[in-house]
Curated annotation (Swiss-Prot):
Pfam families, per database record: Poly_export (PF02563), SLBB_2 (PF22461), Wza_C (PF18412)
Record's protein name: Amylovoran export outer membrane protein AmsH
Chief place where the protein resides: membrane
Subcellular location: Cell outer membrane
Record keyword Transmembrane present: yes
GO molecular function: polysaccharide transmembrane transporter activity; porin activity
Lipid-acceptor residues (N-palmitoyl cysteine): 21
GO cellular component terms, semicolon-separated: cell outer membrane; pore complex
InterPro entries registered for this protein in UniProt: Poly_export (IPR049712), Poly_export_N (IPR003715), SLBB_dom (IPR054765), Wza_C (IPR040716)
Recorded family membership: Belongs to the BexD/CtrA/VexA family.
Functional description taken from the UniProt entry: Involved in the biosynthesis of amylovoran which functions as a virulence factor. Might be involved in the translocation of polysaccharides across the outer membrane.
């Protein structure tokens, strides 16, 4: 029996070596014995669904975002020039009739004008002595002044009437999300723009995504770039706010970049307000692992968006065999959900297989020595 076992030793060694083809580092999930739901395109060829672009200086230059330049906003200027506040339900008016103090309720030492003024009732009217109810909701201050003066003229000769809004309570806009103080802001006789509202809210927080702000007006959403407005002076991004408008500043949680492969620390990185370049992403991952990384295989995998896409990803390859090529990495700007992947060298992959084989080979070797020892006995 010992002789037969000895003859099996070469077969055992060969089997161990051949099994190296399947001994690969990392996790494994077998589909054997599981219910696999077949799809129409289950046998798709991934190579047909991606584009690969070697990064060159000319390509990097073409892909640079176009610089945003300062520009005026003629539409906003017209709106500001023609702006007139219209009185609404809940506002408090202060009506003064000169030389007729009996028609003016003075604000006392401990009472403000908003406490003693004329409140606009739910039916849109105020009550005023002699002339009764006056409809003011939807009217401007000038229109209200003329209406009261006209009706008072039956009782007062040439009345000099002044009307002001003592308290603006009827109309509001809302600033929400990543601002220092979110909440409602009153629409007043001073026009309120996006920039005014952000400043009144105390500015943006450190986690704000200032590129993808959303303005909701009349049920429709409009994208706003506060980066273009506040950093580059693009006034086309500034809009006049109207009652009921909602200005939402999102968090930057969706501005993620994934760094994987042969880097010293794989990571999910958040892009800050200034964005992120390929070199910055690699630096944040503590750089490539020089002992195992393939310098010719630095890839940026970028998902292709859109319903009618024919490709699922564009892949950009940076060859850093010459470290001078890293300068292109400083110019290549990443986008949210880009995957930065650094491949390993062929030798590294082989060494990993060998490292898995060594325990098996050692075990076979020890078994062989033991059999030989027994045989000698």
């Amino acid at each position: 029996m010992i002789i037969i076992k000895t003859k099996l030793i070469p077969l055992m060694v060969s089997a161990a070596l051949l099994s190296g083809c399947t001994i690969v580092p990392g996790n494994h999930l077998s589909t054997m014995g599981k219910d696999v739901v077949e799809q129409q395109d289950s046998d798709f060829d991934i190579d047909k669904y991606v584009n690969i672009f070697p990064l060159t200086p000319s390509l990097v230059e073409r892909m640079k975002p176009k610089p945003v330049v300062a520009q005026a906003n003629a539409t906003l200027q017209r709106e500001l020039q023609n702006y007139e506040y219209r009185i609404g339900v809940g506002d408090v008016l202060m009506v003064t009739v000169w030389d007729h103090p009996e028609l003016t309720t003075p604000a006392g030492q401990y009472r403000s004008a908003s406490d003693t003024g004329n409140w606009v009732h739910s039916d849109g009217t105020i009550f005023y002595p002699y002339i009764g109810r006056v409809r003011v909701a939807g009217h401007t201050v000038q229109e209200t002044r003329d209406e009261i003066a006209s009706r008072l003229s039956k009782y007062v000769e040439s009345p000099q009437v002044d009307v002001n809004v003592a308290s603006f309570k009827s109309q509001k806009t809302y600033v929400t999300g990543e601002v220092t103080t979110s909440g409602q802001q009153a629409i007043t006789n001073v026009p309120l723009t996006i920039l005014d509202a952000i400043n009144a809210a105390g500015g943006l927080t450190a986690t704000a995504d200032w590129r993808n702000v959303v303005l909701t007006h009349d049920g429709r959403e409009q994208p706003v770039s506060l980066q273009a407005l506040m950093q580059n002076g693009d006034l086309s991004q500034n809009h006049l706010l109207y009652p009921g408008d909602i200005l939402y500043v999102p968090r930057n949680d969706d501005l993620k970049v994934f760094v994987m492969g042969e880097v010293k620390q794989q990571a999910t990185l958040k892009m800050d307000r200034s964005g992120m370049t390929l070199s910055e992403a690699l630096g944040s991952a503590q750089g490539m692992d020089q002992s195992v990384a393939d310098a010719t295989g630095v890839f940026v995998i970028r998902p292709v968006k859109g319903a009618n896409r024919s490709k699922i990803a564009n892949i950009y390859q940076l060859n850093t065999k010459d470290a001078a090529a890293m300068v292109m990495g400083t110019e290549f700007r990443l986008e949210p959900y880009d995957i930065v992947y650094v491949t390993s060298t062929p030798l590294t992959r082989w060494n990993r297989v060998i490292s898995q084989l060594v325990p098996t080979i050692s075990g076979v070797y020890d078994a062989t020595r033991n059999v030989q020892t027994i045989h000698k006995w």
